[in-house]
């Protein structure tokens, strides 16, 4: 659409230069429509829409692949719509990562913060995995880009938050603080290992009975009865 608009305008400008005449009314009408469409793009798509689509993009193709032009094409709009909300790609990535982190924090509070019994909290942590597919796919791709300057601090904050919740739950189950921290590390290592195996197609499908069996095995193995 952008190339067509540009070609049309170039042709009109060329005609104007040769004829020295004023632009005909249909050209003015065209310009009004074009401006209206651009304004509609900016109004229709919010910054949140771009952030959500960026997270979907990251989940599918990784952090390094995220770029303005393919993202705009994927959303069926021009890059002008993007620049109405963000000064550049880094700003979008920062906002998208913040959105993901806040979503993860809310989920963590639901699975580990709002349940009274510590064992039930830990069980909920694992059983939420298949219900939060996008969250875990994004996290997997962020781990693959852990050295990225915008990704690294987000991963550190998320890991710290999760480890604190896990350690607290194991302490409430009767473990001393050091053992609880070690058990939390082991539990979180299993989760991270699962994400790596998933990237290599070595895990059951998240919606399969085999995956449910795997989760139950992890729960039985890692969480005291």
Task: Map each language-model feature to its residues.
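An amphipathic alpha-helix signature
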Residues: 105, 123, 160-167, 171, ...
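A detector for short, charged/polar N-terminal pre-domain segments
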Residues: 39-45
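Helix-turn-helix
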Residues: 46-49, 53-91, 95
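Amphipathic alpha-helical segments used for helix-helix packing
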Residues: 132-156, 200
């Amino acid at each position: 659409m952008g190339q067509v608009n540009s070609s049309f305008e170039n042709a009109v400008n060329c005609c104007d230069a040769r004829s020295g005449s004023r632009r005909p009314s249909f050209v003015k009408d065209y310009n009004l429509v074009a401006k209206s469409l651009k304004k509609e793009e900016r109004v229709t798509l919010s910054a949140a829409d771009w952030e959500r689509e960026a997270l979907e993009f990251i989940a599918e193709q990784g952090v390094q692949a995220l770029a303005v032009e393919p993202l705009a094409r994927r959303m069926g709009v021009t890059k002008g719509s993007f620049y109405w909300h963000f000064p550049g790609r880094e700003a979008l990535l920062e906002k998208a990562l913040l959105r993901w982190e806040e979503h993860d924090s809310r989920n963590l509070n639901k699975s580990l913060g709002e349940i009274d019994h510590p064992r039930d909290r830990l069980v909920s942590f694992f059983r939420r995995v298949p219900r939060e597919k996008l969250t875990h796919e994004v996290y997997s791709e962020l781990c693959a880009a852990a050295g990225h300057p915008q990704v690294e601090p987000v991963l550190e904050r998320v890991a710290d938050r999760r480890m604190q919740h896990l350690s607290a739950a194991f302490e409430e189950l009767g473990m001393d603080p050091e053992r609880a921290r070690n058990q939390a590390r082991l539990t979180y290592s299993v989760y991270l290992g699962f994400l790596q195996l998933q990237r290599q197609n070595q895990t059951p499908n998240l919606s399969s009975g085999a995956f449910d069996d795997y989760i139950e095995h992890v729960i039985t193995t890692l969480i005291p009865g």
